[in-house]
């Protein structure tokens, strides 16, 4: 729509005005048209949306002014007369006008921009074209056509060139070649502070206990784990008594278990010389009493002749272990005789002893019963409803035990009619209260009732006490006090109660026939196998190879049915095996003849077509029918037949073997205290078994015995499996059928007895080893003895600290033990002679005490002659003792009878102490009142230096003793002693030591020798424990790996394969060889053994005892934490560990894991080590530092282990897979194995091929934890140190592992190269490259500088070392490494085991004058060889057992000088060049300075040569100089040749620390096989 403006025709504008109007009209027309379109569109769409004003569509023509249409509300028209200032024919509101104006302005800007572009772009294009085509060519043409002439002199030109070269050199030298100086600062890792979380309370007093019951609970721990009913039974009759200060109590008249609730009691014992009236001065020990007035007071009271044994404080027992055994076993018979009938020993009609306590017969036959004036705890009148009927097991009130003994014994009373007061449970013991004291007494009646009601609990308590009696009293007296004769006499005197001869009819021809079988088999085996024990073939063995529990049930039921159906029948049918023969055919293993000869009382045998019964009680044979057999006559020998030729069938031969087995079993059961007279007692035991604690032989599935059978190899232990199921099954059958428990036991054990032949000289039991079982001598003699050099064994001055075996159990002559010491000691050990103690004759039993108590043997038992024995495995004995408590009671009774008086008094004074983790035993500065011997656990002694710093004096594991020096010198404690974990101690009071010193001076001499040996060890090795004073960062972790007994394996976070890691570590332990073996524990093992309530509140006591027994049985226990972080088993692993291995994946996140947080929350002070698992044998530089940076609690170092692992967590107990999944997985495994060998993938990481399995990472870790690490110390000597590489190669070829490396100067360089990859090949290459750089004279010349501090800048030297190590840290090295330096700022020796490797290797190689000192945290470090060039003492302090020390230092010229009292320098110069001079050349100034610098190093070298366990090696490299690096190959060959010769010579001498099995050791192992029950 066009908008036109009407003008009058009369007015005609000029042309320019007309043009302007027209243009404006056009623009206005366009705007109007847009507005019209908007208006029409809005009207079309919606009239309501249109503006209130609009154009008039038909404006009438009027005057000259334009015609407008206004709305009434609009403002007046535009006042401006100019046409351009107001839009024609329209008027907009303010907002509309503003929009129009802004649009017009934008359009104006765009137009101007376009116009500018149209003007500028063409001009730019034009300029560019002209510049490139015209200007530049013109300028170049002009320049090239010019001729310039520069005139300079040579000086100016030289200066310019020098400036240019200097600039380039500076850039390359200081910006490109010194990258090593711009590495981020990584200082040495500061070793963590000692973790000390001790309790405020001390170990003797127990504050916070409010009543006597709490003190009773503390003292009752000696009984071990007690169930609630048993505990209530003991406590319900407990009585208390008040003692005023100074009151004495005659414990000899007390009967019961006494303990101190509150106060202090002194225990006195009668002196041996009490009866000597002519001697005076008997008084209490002044060394114990603090004042003489107290001694005088005691004398005035008439207590002369008594000596102070010990002082008993709160919660401690006044009774000894012996007293407890006496209370339990006071009415048990000592010996069961052969001709004692069961009817004569029946106690069913004997009244309870409580009803008649003063019976003369009772007092007579109960040696430990005492008439007590106070009858509060014993009813004087018979009471039927007070206590239940007395069990026959108590055997109380019976006149039978001694009256029916036809053979006089030494322990019998003279006359049974006169009542005689027997020996008390507290013989010759007197107690005196020092202060007002409250004591508690558990009367003897409580123990008798406990024996009747809970026989199994009683047996369990006795077993615990017997074990502690062995571990505390016997072991201490045997090895610590030197009372070997007294201890070993116990078992010797025990033989009079355990010796039972075989019946006469088993002598003569029967025995000869038995021997002939072994003779034939020995001839068949040959001389080599003849050194082993040969076991007689057991036909029932094939039955026992099946499931034991079902077969036991079948056997018991079959015996029962046989007894019911045919007591008097002839014989049962005989079942033959796969074939039969008509004679004794050695090698016939397939005979499975089943002889049904077990009845309720008799065993029937098929002999020559007749049925003969063997009476188990009397040992006589009677025929089933017909005329009497000659076998029934005692005088006739067995197997004597009529004159006609009688041929034995194979069945008859087996019957003879069965006769021997039955007779041997009868004798063994009598020796154990099980006879037909105890049938009712045993039945009572079975019936009460459910209410008693159930003990399981945890050793039954591990102790495997393999016999060399006369007819093949058999495994007698395959039969039993789980002893619990067998016990319960036989119990149920017995109780159901009413058959004699003894007979059922005999039936079960019939197949367990083995008849074994040992040739002369065979070792049946070895000292220090657990007894394999019980031996009954059929024919021959056994020799029991000890090595004669046992006392002289160097307990301390060996190459290692004393372990449990050294102090408590010196295992001298243990040929089977893999020794890690040198060959000389091994040869002396093999040549050690032995001293015979006594002989075991036919009918005697050996291994009685050790087999039942499961403790190590104090003696070794050998065959004096060719000997035939019956053998019952230890696991079977443990099962018998578990099911029949009378076995333990009988042993307890016999022990209390034969115990020497001296051992008894030691037992009274020795205190069994149990301390919790972190508890302080004594503080620094306390009075030395006792010696502590560690039975179980770990202690740490720390010294408070006063400035807030604490240092460790030592750690003490199982068998170590603490405090002898302080006790003997009566000095104060040098440090604070606290328990790292829950610990059991034997407290040896000073009062006992003083008492024994008066009556037994030999004990004082023994302990004096021990202290002297320790002092000599400290003097000879002053630096072994790291006592060399260095900087804090140079100190090694304060804990020690010596004598570790428990190791826990914990993951850092979930998903780490700790189970697989634990299994591999266990295998490595077994191959390395741990004394007494090693075992691993998982949660499943604990639950299988102790049940699902093992971690309950009550079950923890039982668990603690079980774990303590395991630690006693094995040399190392490995706890694998395979549960969640909050599981009880995880807490148990941490609490029981001497050392904790935190396993982490090296490529994982180094953040703190949840297991570590839990570990820190428990505040354990055990040693903690970090184990990083790598998929490949390579550690990235700086990776280890990331792991250790935030873990200051890692105080035991770290280990790099290569192990292939899965990224996803593998379940501990994987679910059973289907067959298809299993096959698929198997195929995938096979494919992966094939690809492993067919793929040609190039490894980018170093390859380490171990020539022997002992060089693996797990073996290295196992040796580290066992204290058997092999260390390599490399000395300094410049270029002569290249020989180190040859020696290392010789060590690798000899199969000697290297676990720790230490070096000085060039030794630190070579050692670091080898420790980085644990491979000699890359070390050789990098060392040769470095030698090439050092041999370059140009590099040396370019590095020269003004000799203010040194002749060179050290840059080329730094470059050569940095190119060898890069930015690797010492922590990244695969093997543990350290180097030493001399800190001239603080004048001390420092050791470095962390930080950049190149820096500290360079510092250790910094020769003064040639290279400037290295600045490290403000200190100047120089060559470590100035103080110690061969750091053997440092290596020894790290726990290395065997050390190879290679010395390549220069030898000083020691030619005597004679130039006089003054010296002219001119004469010295002339004399040096005078060939005719006879005087030696005096040293130069530099030589004097060098010798002065190495003065302390020479002394350290001499000490290193004499260090025990150090193998000193010095290759012949004296012909080479310090800087002869150009002769690399020659020096390397010299070292390699020397190493080969040295190791070959050492191998021939038997001194190599490797586990090689020579032919001699193989024969020795075969000879020693019987002691491990491998007969």
From Swiss-Prot:
MF annotations from Gene Ontology: lysophospholipase activity
Residues annotated as domain PNPLA: 1272-1436
Protein origin, superkingdom: Eukaryota
Regions of compositional bias (Low complexity) in chain numbering: 19-48
Placement of sequence motif DGA/G: 1423-1425
Cytoplasmic side of membrane: 1-99, 173-1575
Coarse class of the protein's main subcellular location: endoplasmic reticulum
InterPro entries: Acyl_Trfase/lysoPLipase, cNMP-bd_dom, cNMP-bd_dom_sf, LysoPLipase_patatin_CS, NTE, NTE1_P-loop_dom, PNPLA_dom, RmlC-like_jellyroll
Residues engaged in binding a nucleoside 3',5'-cyclic phosphate 1: 737-856
Name of protein: Lysophospholipase NTE1
Organism expressing this protein natively: Coccidioides immitis (strain RS)
């Amino acid at each position: 729509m066009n908008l036109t403006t009407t003008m009058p025709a009369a007015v005609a504008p000029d042309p320019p005005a007309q043009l302007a109007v027209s243009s404006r009209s056009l623009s206005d027309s366009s705007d109007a048209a847009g507005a019209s379109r908007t208006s029409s569109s809005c009207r079309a769409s919606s009239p309501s949306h249109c503006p209130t004003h609009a154009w008039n569509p038909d404006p009438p023509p009027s005057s000259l002014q334009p015609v407008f249409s206004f709305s009434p509300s609009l403002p007046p028209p535009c006042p401006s007369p100019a046409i351009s200032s107001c839009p024609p024919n329209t008027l907009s509101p303010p907002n509309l006008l503003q929009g129009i104006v802004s649009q017009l302005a934008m359009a104006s800007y765009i137009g101007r921009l376009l116009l500018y572009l149209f003007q500028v772009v063409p001009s730019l294009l034009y300029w560019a074209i002209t510049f490139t085509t015209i200007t530049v060519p013109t300028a170049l043409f002009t320049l090239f056509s010019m001729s310039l002439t520069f005139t300079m002199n040579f000086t100016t030109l030289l200066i310019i060139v020098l400036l240019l070269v200097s600039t380039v050199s500076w850039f390359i030298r200081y910006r490109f070649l010194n990258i090593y100086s711009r590495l981020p600062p990584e200082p040495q890792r500061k070793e963590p502070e000692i973790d000390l979380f001790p309790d405020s309370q001390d170990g003797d007093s127990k504050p916070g206990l409010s009543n006597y019951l709490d003190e009773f609970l503390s003292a009752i721990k000696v009984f071990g784990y007690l169930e609630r009913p048993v505990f209530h039974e003991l406590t319900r009759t407990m009585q208390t008594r008040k003692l005023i200060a100074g009151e004495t109590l005659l414990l000899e008249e007390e009967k019961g278990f006494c303990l101190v609730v509150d106060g202090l009691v002194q225990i006195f014992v009668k002196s041996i010389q009490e009866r000597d009236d002519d001697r005076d001065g008997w008084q209490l020990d002044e060394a114990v009493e603090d004042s003489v007035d107290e001694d005088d007071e005691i004398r005035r009271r008439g207590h002369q002749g008594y000596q102070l044994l010990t002082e008993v404080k709160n919660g401690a027992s006044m009774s000894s272990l012996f007293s407890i055994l006496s209370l339990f076993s006071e009415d048990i018979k000592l010996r069961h005789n052969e001709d004692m009938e069961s009817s004569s020993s029946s106690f069913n009609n004997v009244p309870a002893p409580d009803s008649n306590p003063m019976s003369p017969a009772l007092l007579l036959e109960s040696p430990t019963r005492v008439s007590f004036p106070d009858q509060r705890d014993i009813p004087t009148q018979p009471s039927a409803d007070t206590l239940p009927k007395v069990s026959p097991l108590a055997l109380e009130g019976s006149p039978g035990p001694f009256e029916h003994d036809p053979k006089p014994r030494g322990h019998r009373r003279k006359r049974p009619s006169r009542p005689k007061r027997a020996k008390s449970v507290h013989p010759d013991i007197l107690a005196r209260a020092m202060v007002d004291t409250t004591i508690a007494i558990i009367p003897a009646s409580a123990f008798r009732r406990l024996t009747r009601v809970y026989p199994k609990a009683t047996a369990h308590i006795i077993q615990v006490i017997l074990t502690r009696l062995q571990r505390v009293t016997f072991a201490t007296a045997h090895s610590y006090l030197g009372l070997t004769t007294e201890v070993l006499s116990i078992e010797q005197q025990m033989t009079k109660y355990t010796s039972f001869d075989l019946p006469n009819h088993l002598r003569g021809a029967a025995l000869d026939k038995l021997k002939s079988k072994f003779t034939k088999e020995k001839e068949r085996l040959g001389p080599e196998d003849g050194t082993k024990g040969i076991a007689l073939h057991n036909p029932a063995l094939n039955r026992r190879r099946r499931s034991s529990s079902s077969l036991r049930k079948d056997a018991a039921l079959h015996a029962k049915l046989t007894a019911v159906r045919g007591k008097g029948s002839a014989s049962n049918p005989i079942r033959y095996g796969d074939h039969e023969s008509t004679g004794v055919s050695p090698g016939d293993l397939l005979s499975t003849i089943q002889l049904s000869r077990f009845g309720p009382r008799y065993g029937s045998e098929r002999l020559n077509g007749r049925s003969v019964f063997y009476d188990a009680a009397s040992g006589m044979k009677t025929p089933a029918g017909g005329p009497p057999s000659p076998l029934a006559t005692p005088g006739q020998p067995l197997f004597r037949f009529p004159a006609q030729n009688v041929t034995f069938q194979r069945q008859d031969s087996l019957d003879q073997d069965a006769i021997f087995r039955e007779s041997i079993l009868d004798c063994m059961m009598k020796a154990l205290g099980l006879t037909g007279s105890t049938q009712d007692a045993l039945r009572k035991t079975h019936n009460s078994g459910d209410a008693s604690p159930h003990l399981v032989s945890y050793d039954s599935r591990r102790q495997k015995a393999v016999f060399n059978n006369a007819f093949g190899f058999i495994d007698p232990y395959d039969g039993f499996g789980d002893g619990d199921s067998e016990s319960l099954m036989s119990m149920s059958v017995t109780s159901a059928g009413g058959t004699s428990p003894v007979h059922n036991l005999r039936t079960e054990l019939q197949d367990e007895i083995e008849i074994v032949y040992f040739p002369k000289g065979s070792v049946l039991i070895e000292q220090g080893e657990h007894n394999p079982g019980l031996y009954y001598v059929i024919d021959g003699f056994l020799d029991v003895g000890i090595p004669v050099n046992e006392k002289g064994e160097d307990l301390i001055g060996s190459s290692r600290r004393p372990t449990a075996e050294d102090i408590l159990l010196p295992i001298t002559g243990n040929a089977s033990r893999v020794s890690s010491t040198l060959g000389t000691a091994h040869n002396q050990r093999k040549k050690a002679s032995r001293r015979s103690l006594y002989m075991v004759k036919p009918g005697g039993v050996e291994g009685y005490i050790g087999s039942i108590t499961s403790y190590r043997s104090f003696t070794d038992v050998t065959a004096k002659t060719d000997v035939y024995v019956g053998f019952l495995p230890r696991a079977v004995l443990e099962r018998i003792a578990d099911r029949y408590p009378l076995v333990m009671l009988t042993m307890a009774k016999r022990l209390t009878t034969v115990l020497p008086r001296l051992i008894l008094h030691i037992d009274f004074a020795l205190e069994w102490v149990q301390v919790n983790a972190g508890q302080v035993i004594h503080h620094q500065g306390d009075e030395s009142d006792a010696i502590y011997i560690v039975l179980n656990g770990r202690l740490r002694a720390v010294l408070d230096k006063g400035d807030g710093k604490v240092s460790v004096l030592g750690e003490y594991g199982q068998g170590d003793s603490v405090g002898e020096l302080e006790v003997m010198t009566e000095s104060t404690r040098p440090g604070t002693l606290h328990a790292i974990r829950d610990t059991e101690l034997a407290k040896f009071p000073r009062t006992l030591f003083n008492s024994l010193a008066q009556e037994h001076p030999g004990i004082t001499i023994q302990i004096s020798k021990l202290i002297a040996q320790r002092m000599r060890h400290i003097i000879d090795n002053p630096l072994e424990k790291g006592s060399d004073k260095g900087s804090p960062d140079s100190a090694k972790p304060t804990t020690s790996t010596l004598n570790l007994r428990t190791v826990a394996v914990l993951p850092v976070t979930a998903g780490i394969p700790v189970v697989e890691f634990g299994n591999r570590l266990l295998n490595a332990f077994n191959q390395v060889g741990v004394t007494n073996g090693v075992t691993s524990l998982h949660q499943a093992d604990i639950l299988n053994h102790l049940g699902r309530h093992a971690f309950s509140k009550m079950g923890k006591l039982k668990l603690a005892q079980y774990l303590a027994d395991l630690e006693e049985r094995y040399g190392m226990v490995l706890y694998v934490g395979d549960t969640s972080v909050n599981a009880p088993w995880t807490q148990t692993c941490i609490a029981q560990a001497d050392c904790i291995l935190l396993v982490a994946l090296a490529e994982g996140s180094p953040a703190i894991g949840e297991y570590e947080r839990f570990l820190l929350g428990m505040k354990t002070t055990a040693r903690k080590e970090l184990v990083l698992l790598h998929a490949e044998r390579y550690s990235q530089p700086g990776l280890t530092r990331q792991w250790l940076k935030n873990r200051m609690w890692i105080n035991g170092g770290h280990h790099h282990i290569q192990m292939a692992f899965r990224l996803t967590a593998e379940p501990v107990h994987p679910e059973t897979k289907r067959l298809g999944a299993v096959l698929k997985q198997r195929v995938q495994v096979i494919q992966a194995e094939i690809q492993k060998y067919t793929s040609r993938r190039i490894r980018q990481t170093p390859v380490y091929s171990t020539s022997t399995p002992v060089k693996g990472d797990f073996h290295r870790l196992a040796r580290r934890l066992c204290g058997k690490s092999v260390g390599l110390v490399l000395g300094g000597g410049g270029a002569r140190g290249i020989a180190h590489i040859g020696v290392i190669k010789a060590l690798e070829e000899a199969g000697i592992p290297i676990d720790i490396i230490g070096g000085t100067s060039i030794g630190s360089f070579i050692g670091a190269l080898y420790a980085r990859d644990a491979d000699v090949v890359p070390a050789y290459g990098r060392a040769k490259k470095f030698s090439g750089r050092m041999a370059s004279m140009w590099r040396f010349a370019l590095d020269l500088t003004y000799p203010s501090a040194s002749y060179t800048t050290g840059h080329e030297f730094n470059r050569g070392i940095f190119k060898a190590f890069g930015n690797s840290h010492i922590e990244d090295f695969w093997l543990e490494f350290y180097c030493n330096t001399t800190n001239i700022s603080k004048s001390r020796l420092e050791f470095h085991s962390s930080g950049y490797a190149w820096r500290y290797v360079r510092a250790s190689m910094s020769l003064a004058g040639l290279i400037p000192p290295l600045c490290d945290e403000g200190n100047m470090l120089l060559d470590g060889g100035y103080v110690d060039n061969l750091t053997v003492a440092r290596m020894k302090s790290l726990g290395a057992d065997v050390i190879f020390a290679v010395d390549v230092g220069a030898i000083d010229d020691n030619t005597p000088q004679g130039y006089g009292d003054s010296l002219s320098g001119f004469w010295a110069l002339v004399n040096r060049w005078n060939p005719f001079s006879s005087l030696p050349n005096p040293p130069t100034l530099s030589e004097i300075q060098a010798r002065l610098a190495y003065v302390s190093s020479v002394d350290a070298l001499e000490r290193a040569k004499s260090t025990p366990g150090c193998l000193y090696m010095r290759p012949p490299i004296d012909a080479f100089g310090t800087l002869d690096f150009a002769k690399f190959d020659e020096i390397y060959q010299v070292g390699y040749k020397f190493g080969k010769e040295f190791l070959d010579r050492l191998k021939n001498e038997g001194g190599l620390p490797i586990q090689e099995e020579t032919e001699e050791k193989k024969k020795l192992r075969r000879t020693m096989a019987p002691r491990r029950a491998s007969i």
